[in-house]
Amino acid sequence: MNPKIEDSEFNWENEDIVMKLVDEKGKAHPVSKAELLESLESRKLGLETRVLDKYHENHVAFENVLVLDAPQDLETIVNLLLPWYMGKTLTLFEGPLNYPDSSRLAQIISKHNVDIVLGSDYNYSIPNPEYLKLFPVPSLKLVDLPNFESISNYLTISR
């Protein structure tokens, strides 16, 4: 027999800890509901502002966000959760950007019709970025990476 499961409403309080991030030294850093929601809202507004600044329109549709980061700190967790927070599709990128060749990133963007690429690491690199030109990426509207200028000449972003 299955025990009866009662519906109960549970509401997180703003000060409740919703996760703990553990750094490389093993130290736990608690994240409250309020801190997570504030970070998500800030990142969402920043992304919407970047899209608005680039296209000068109020409604530029985007549905699929590619996230390059592995969750390791609050910034990368926010990047991971942001598409869902905004009601968008999340595409995850796993592995090196240049394996089996440097066109891999463009292939994934093209295959999954990615609109926006998010990342927070300054160390993303693509040894032969000219290979990115082999695969058109007409769906791509915005790349939000700290070092994006190193590959911006090779990805054609739709306007």
UniProtKB/Swiss-Prot annotation:
This is Uncharacterized protein ZK112.5. It comes from Caenorhabditis elegans. It comes from the Eukaryota.
